[in-house]
Structure formats: C-alpha cells, structure tokens
Amino acid sequence: MANAPHGGVLKDLLVRDAPIAAQLRQEADTLPEIVLTERQLCDLELIINGGFSPLQGFMNQTDYNGCLDNMRLADGNLFPMPITLDVDEQQIEALKIQQGARIALRDPRDDNAIAIITVTDVYAVDKVREATAVFGSDDLAHPAITYLHKSVKNFYVGGDVQAVSKPAYYDYVALRYTPAELRQHFAKISWRKVVAFQTRNPMHRAHRELTVRAARQRQANVLIHPVVGMTKPGDVDHYTRVRVYQSLMPRYPNGMATLALLPLAMRMGGPREALWHAIIRKNFGVTHFIVGRDHAGPGKDSSGKDFYGPYDAQTLVTKYTEELGIEMVPFQQMTYIPSTDEYQPVDEVTPGTQTMDISGTELRRRLRTGAAIPDWFSYESVVKTLRESYPPKAKQGFTLFLTGLHNSGKDQIARALQVKLNEQGGRSVSLLLGETVRSELSSELGFSPDDRQKNIQRISFVAAELTRAGAAVIAAPIAPYEKSRATARDIITKTGGAGNFFLIHVATPLEYCEATDRKGNYAKARAGQIKGFTGVDDVYEEPTDADLVVDISRQSVAEITHSIILLLEAQSLI
C-alpha cells in the first residue's frame, strides 16, 4: 500500500471535467497575466499535481512566516521550504494585484495558461531573513542565496490556484508521473514498500550498489527519482542524465527498480531540503527515502568551509521521521574494495583495507581529456553516454575572439587561421568577420554604443551555438568596449558547451592602422565624414584580460597565426 500523502489528502488540483477546464481556459484569456520564471513553473507544477501537498497554492504571509520560523504551515503541517510567487512593484501596479484579484499564470515556454491564482495577500520580502532562516547563511557563495538576492523580486503574492492545464513536455514523457499516476503504478505492479533515491547527478556503480543495499535491508523495491527541473549551476544536463539512468536500469535485478522524473527546482538547502524531499516523496507514495552524505549540499561557502555538516541532513530528517510517516534510510559514502571487487559504506570498511574512489573533479578531468574510466567505477554504457555529451578537448568547439582597431590586421589573421584550422581538420571552421556580420546580421544597426553592444551580442549568440556544436569559430569584430567583450565571454563560456573562449587583442598601434589604411576610412573620419569612428572620435578600451596580445606592425601574420595555434595546443584543443 502506498504511503499516505502529507497532510492526509493528496492535493491534486488538475481539473478532469472537460467543461470546467474549458471554462477556466476561457477565463484565463481575459485575466491579467504573469509569465512564470523557470523556478516558478517547476513550483507550480508540483503544487497542482499534489507533489507539494498540503499546499494548494503559493504561500500567504502567515504560512510563509511559519515556514521560516518553525518549518510549519498555519495548519500545523510540517513544510520546511518557502514556495512563493515573486513579483515587483511595476507588476503589482500594472496588473492590479490585490486581495481577491484573479491572475493567469503562464508557461514561459509556450505562453499557455497553467493556472489561475486568487490573491489572498501581497507582502514584502526580507531577503536576508529568508536566507538566514532557510539556508542558515546570507553568503552569496550559496547558489540559492545568489538567486534570492539577484533574481527574486521584492514582493510575494499568496493565494490558492486552480489548474488550467499541465505544462507540456516533449522529452521522456513516459517517465513523467504525477503523484497520483505513480501511486497507481505502484499498485499495478504490487509494490508495497518503496525506497526512493534522489539524485541530480549521473549514477555509477556505487549508486547502484547503494540502492540495492537499501532495498535488501528494507525488503523493498527501488524508485530512482532524479530531479529534472532546476539543479545546481554547472550540473550535467538532464537529457544526458536521463540517458544514463535508462542505461543503468537493466543492471538491477528484473522487477526491482523503476525510473520516474521529478520536475523540481532544487534550492541546495541541505538539511531543510532533505526534509522537503522526504515530504515530496511521501506525496508520491514512497515509504522509504535514502538520505546520503551532504544531501542537497551546495558546496563551500566564501571562506572555503562546507555550508552544512556531512550528516546534518540525516539528523534533521531523523528528528521528524515519526511525524512524517516516511522512513529515512541513512547511507554514508560508498567506496570500492579492490580485493573483493565490491562497494561498501566507508563506515563498514575494516581499517587498513585498500579502497579506491574517483572524485567528481577527477571524473570530469577524465572525460575532458579522454582518459580511461575504469569498469570498477562505472558501466561501459554509462561512460559511453557521458562521452557523447562531454567529448574530450580535441573534439570540443572553441571561439577565437579577435578584437582591435579598424585595419589592425584582424581580418588577415582570421582568414589565415581559417586556412590553418581547415588544414588541421577534425572540426568545421566558421569565420565571423566584422564587416560580414554587419552586412548579414546587423545591417539595420549603426555605431552608437547601444548598437555596438547589440552587434556583439548577436555575434556571441551565433558563436556560442557553433561552439556548442563542436565548431572552431573565429570572430573578428572591433568590439571596442570592455562591456561588450565581457558579454561575449559570458555568453560563449556559459552556453557554448565546454565554453572554450579565447580573447585575442590585436594591439596594432593606431598610427600604423591609419598609415596603412588603403580605403581611407581614417582620413574620412578625421574630416568628419564618418562619425563615431573607433580611434578617432570614439574610444577603444584596451583589454586587460586578453589571452593573447599580438601586433601586426611587429609580427608577421604567419608568426601570429602560429602563436594562436600554440595557444590552442596548450589547451589540448588541437
């Protein structure tokens, strides 16, 4: 029998009566609307499907204060994580958000109305208080605290919601169970005791052994329940992770384990988050929940210390186990014993026994360099999946971003690089020359600071997409402003796959650029015929963070090209 929902009743708000659903959709089209953020969408989905039972909407101020102060809602139910809908003053005024107002909540991906909220109150946020109460700190090294201070708006809207529709998904649809559906699935396959395993990382042999041990100890089945909403910045993308989980499932004895995806926006809140995760799994019908070492920990604070103790999460969940009605299965870190070819919890290893481990950092290094990943650590199918998504350096894309004055030699260097990289082979090469981009992508833009910024953003977007696809990108705009170049670096390193970005300052002196200007553009600018010309009546802010500085007045194109090739070789990219 599945576990009872938290609070006694599963708050499944999905409307199954077609006429009522149609009426709500019709009403939503007439209401003021809030387009949700990614986190708000994740939260709303788990509100309307019952994953956050007993919540029936976003927290009002009374529930919010109770959650912060003693982890309890006004009705006395335990709930350790604030679930809030943040808005700013402009939205409050423009949408007339006040008690009794009805607001449509829309999916940012397709603009569909997901729910209608009936506002009970609007209240100001004390972000320092929230950070300290929930995360035990106000240190911006914590990703959720950074999000709170930099992304969350200054007011919260409380109120119950009515579901209009479910968020649409096109990936892994068969694995996306609501709490009611997963409970039905457990009943169908006659699972009475279920151990849930929460993860935001790929799984390897240690994780398989840990979950099998947990099932054996509790005479239960295993639910692999990974988070596929928002996780920690820098985590492996959920597409890759789900392929890993799918490849791992046949490694379990037939009928022991099943896989379901959880659209949760994690907060990396350590002990409170572990308690929250247990409540969510209870709502999904689970009877046991694995809490491991440093569960949902965010890593180090700004002083280099862990935000939470390694077993603080286990301690807090244990305190409330009886009230929750879900049994925690505590586990320490698993370690490999070469002599017996098995994994054991570190606290069960006999002193003096040789053990072996591979850290997350070391695994990433091996993936990056193509170094071997041993069978004792992971399975061949898992490693193959990870290598497909995270190829070694020699197969990764990169962007060479050349910046310098007009006629500084950027174009000659860029074209020579294109030839050398094509000669090298192994990846496609794309050339984004300043004049070409201006003609093909930015023909409507002028040369004002704002237009220059937009032009660089467009170049950066294209370069990032090409880099992510494994190409070698050579971009050669003037890019005179530090802000624009920082934007380019940020966009390409964050969205360009491995984020291999190199800023090359073509520092040819203005006098040389002007003296060798066969087109006479500098002369026209001096005569006032061209306005906003870099180096004449517009500034060029010299880079202070260039990866390489070259000068065509002192070096030949061949020498400069060779120095750039050596830079790439030093990074194992060629």
Curated annotation (Swiss-Prot):
Q: What is its EC number?
A: 2.7.7.4
Q: Which InterPro entries match?
A: APS_kinase, ATP-Sase_PUA-like_dom, P-loop_NTPase, PUA-like_sf, Rossmann-like_a/b/a_fold, Sulf_adenylyltr_euk, Sulf_AdTrans/APS_kinase, Sulfurylase_cat_dom
Subcellular location(s): the record lists: Cytoplasm
Keyword S-adenosyl-L-methionine set for record: no
Name its pathway.
Sulfur metabolism; hydrogen sulfide biosynthesis; sulfite from sulfate: step 1/3
Active-site residues, record numbering mapped to chain: T199, R200, N201
Q: What does this protein do?
A: Catalyzes the first intracellular reaction of sulfate assimilation, forming adenosine-5'-phosphosulfate (APS) from inorganic sulfate and ATP. Plays an important role in sulfate activation as a component of the biosynthesis pathway of sulfur-containing amino acids.
Instruction: State how it assembles.
Output: Homohexamer. Dimer of trimers.
Recorded protein name is Sulfate adenylyltransferase
User: Which species?
Assistant: Mycosarcoma maydis (Corn smut fungus)
Source taxonomy: Eukaryota, Fungi, Dikarya, Basidiomycota, Ustilaginomycotina
